Amino acid sequence: MSVEVEYLQHEDYLYRTSKLKEIRDLGINPYPYQYTDCLEVQEIRNQFVDNELGDSEAAFRKETPKVRFAGRLVLFRSMGKNAFGQILDNDAKIQVMFNRDFSAVAGLAADAGISPIKFIEKKLDLGDILGLEGYLFFTHSGELTVLVETVTLLCKSLISLPDKHAGLADKEIRYRKRWADLISSEDVRKTFLTRSRILKLIREYMDQQSFLEVETPILQTVYGGAEATPFVTTLQALHAEMFLRISLEIALKKLLVGGMSRVYEIGKVFRNEGIDRTHNPEFTMIEAYAAYWDYNDVMKCVENLVEYIVRALNNGETQVQYSHLKSGPQVVDFKAPWIRMTMKESISVYGGVDVDLHADHELRKILETQTSLPEKTYVHASRGELIALLFDELVCDKLIAPHHITDHPLETTPLCKTLRSGDETLVERFESFCLGKELCNAYSELNDPLQQRKLLEEQMRKKALNPDSEYHPIDEEFLEALCQGMPPAGGFGIGIDRLVMMLTDAASIRDVLFFPVMRRIEAKKD
């Protein structure tokens, strides 16, 4: 029983493999080992911007600068004794000109029976990767061009490029075949180059604030730091059950105990839960913790960090347009300070409900009549849980401008200090929202080991009553570390994928992940 791989039967693949054989028969290696001492195309474009560089006649006389570079052939047209192509390298393109009497093919023997220009026209295809040496000139229309002296085939492409105008129209194919998507779409390349720059800017800012970047384990014996379902695996060497981390928090707090006063980590986190427009089971976070801070200090850090990134990406501007809200395009200003309000205030302002004027049964009635939540989610909920549900249902998607929503109910987290005012029903937690989505979660971190144990044990009791709940097991090593003594601290976590979505005008988290999780396609079998 053989497995059919569709592209192997495609006419274009068969045609290109026949060319591959012909190229080898000519004594040319279509997959050489290296091609060094190259400039990048963007470097060439940056260095040579003066259109008085010289015309093609000067290039033919070899009087203009000579360059050596490599890239993928993405356009080609033959015009008599000349042929023109376009080379793509990273996100930059440059025009090249091949000439019947000037251009040579590396490795092509003089008695091969085919001229260099015919080899270029007949044996090369769009998608091939080429090394090129030649002389720069400007065309009459001002186009920077390279008159190619020598072309070296570096990789023969056996699959045709996506249509240059339509690109990959099917989104699922784009996500599955990201390599082709990157080749065909300038916008997609720009998105991922911006993602890379955002990561660089985050590190730049955190380093400026004297944070130390660290690495902590992805495989853990106890998972914690968030309410989420973990991925479970087995470590064969120890015959032990292990978990992929659902958060970076616990390990970073242990480093605070060890005397590292400001730490952060950028890394992958895994949650075995749903997939939708803003959620992927594998995602990237930054978590950071600073000794002697509280959540007020963290608020300033978060909004200044995001403003720093936005200004760097937008030539000093703080406004960003986002096009994918149901209400239509919105312009968001990330300039600090952001709007701050308590969770109760936000429910009053955006949901029209003053929770302090309503008893628990009245809050349940509001959830019943104004939301589509199933009754089981709120029928036995505590008052704090009811308030959190009202916020989720009535407020979140209305927070378009950047907001810090502060002072959450105690029930929402066991890892945070209660309000210093003495109200033990609320905690010093804030979540940052923008464009209707959560961007950041942050606390004045709980460092009282006895109170921490009490809250975690309360979670375990709730788990015993509801086996389907997401409450995580107690990490005794973490509690031992707290007993050693953790300084007062503030900490935050930001979902980097979601931040990139907001800053690149992406409709889906899949648009900012090179390889998002996709349903497996079963291969066709005979």
Curated annotation (Swiss-Prot):
Tell me the enzyme class: ligase
User: What does the cofactor field's note say?
Assistant: Binds 3 Mg(2+) ions per subunit.
Q: Which domain of life is it from?
A: Bacteria
Going by the UniProt record, its keywords in alphabetical order are: Aminoacyl-tRNA synthetase, ATP-binding, Cytoplasm, Ligase, Magnesium, Metal-binding, Nucleotide-binding, Protein biosynthesis
Cofactor dependence is on: Mg(2+)
TM spans (from-to): none
- Return the CDD domains for the record: LysRS_N
Gene3D superfamilies, from UniProt?
Answer: Bira Bifunctional Protein, Domain 2, Nucleic acid-binding proteins
The GO cellular component terms are: cytosol
Alphabetical list of SUPFAM superfamilies matching this protein: Class II aaRS and biotin synthetases (SSF55681), Nucleic acid-binding proteins (SSF50249)
- Provide one Gene Ontology biological process annotation: lysyl-tRNA aminoacylation
Positions bound to Mg(2+) 2: 438
Q: Which reaction does it catalyse?
A: tRNA(Lys) + L-lysine + ATP = L-lysyl-tRNA(Lys) + AMP + diphosphate
Q: Give the subcellular location.
A: Cytoplasm
The record's EC number reads 6.1.1.6
Provide the binding site for Mg(2+) 1.
431, 438
Q: Which GO terms describe its molecular function?
A: ATP binding; lysine-tRNA ligase activity; magnesium ion binding; tRNA binding
Matching entries from HAMAP family are given as:
Lys_tRNA_synth_class2
> Member of which family?
Belongs to the class-II aminoacyl-tRNA synthetase family.
On subunit structure and binding partners, the annotation says:
Homodimer.
**Record-given protein name:** Lysine--tRNA ligase
Task: Name the source organism.
Answer: Chlamydia trachomatis serovar L2b (strain UCH-1/proctitis)
